[in-house]
């Protein structure tokens, strides 16, 4: 930190230190008989010198950013400068302050009328320049009169009657006041810039967007305009460039956000398509009971219900039924014993035949006997 006064120097004997001290400058232990003390830090005698002129510091020094300076170099490097003339301010001079800016008494004046501002005067600090109250009010009028557009076509105050009429008024007379403006204010013509004036302003703006007073006076003399008009044009041009830069930045951010959203959406869709695997259609499987192992070809063992025969009502299917082994101790060993393929189903239907035809054949054989 910046210290207002010189730091104190002290000389100690090396034998007085219980532990060998470390030099703040070279970061090496001090084994000399004498050492220097600056703000509770130890230095070699040869390391205690000005960081700018390399001169040895014997009586006093200035400390900033862990570096030591002599008085002359410190004032030359870090002394406060006037915001008006950019010259150094001596410690013995009186100054005027406006926010963070410091001025000489003679430099604390309006940049337009060059009237010195005293204590109690009203002023405005705009872009590092001081404006008295009167010139600031004039500037507000000129800000709307000079346009930095490419055409620079400026209409007179009489042509402002094209604006929409206020509520409750059918039309606006030419002699009436402007919308919301003071009717007592005198009308002023707007400044019209020629092609040569516009080129001169833009060429100077490309060199420096904030020219100094001498450049503004030179432009005013070359273009035949007042210094105030030149200054207002540069202010409007700077505001226009900031607005364009801000708009371009917003468009870039919007495009980047849209592109990022599309990339995220496409990546999500690709992930969903990659993770989707269609399920295979289930195979149609038919469950049937196990056939009887006996070699009987009796068609009534296939689950058909024949007509009741005399004396056969107790066991119409005979001794060997298709369900003969259901109540036995044996059981199916796996699920594969209960499933038949599609080819087995066709052969099963061929063997069974049509139940109606078999019923008619049984009836014919019954009555024939």
Curated annotation (Swiss-Prot):
Q: Which GO terms describe its biological process?
A: neuron differentiation
Instruction: Tell me which domain of life the UniProt entry assigns to the organism this sequence originates from.
Output: Eukaryota
| Record keywords | Activator, Developmental protein, DNA-binding, Homeobox, LIM domain, Metal-binding, Nucleus, Repeat, Transcription, Transcription regulation, Zinc
Do you know which PROSITE patterns this protein is assigned to? HOMEOBOX_1, HOMEOBOX_2, LIM_DOMAIN_1, LIM_DOMAIN_2
**Domain LIM zinc-binding intervals:** 23-73, 82-135
Stored CDD domains = homeodomain, LIM1_Lmx1b, LIM2_Lmx1a_Lmx1b
A single Pfam family it belongs to is: Homeodomain
**DNA-binding interval(s):** 186-245
Q: Which GO terms describe its molecular function?
A: DNA-binding transcription factor activity, RNA polymerase II-specific; metal ion binding; RNA polymerase II transcription regulatory region sequence-specific DNA binding
Tell me how this protein assembles: Interacts with DHX9.
**Biological function:** Transcription factor involved in the regulation of podocyte-expressed genes. Essential for the specification of dorsal limb fate at both the zeugopodal and autopodal levels.
What is the protein's name according to its record?
LIM homeobox transcription factor 1-beta
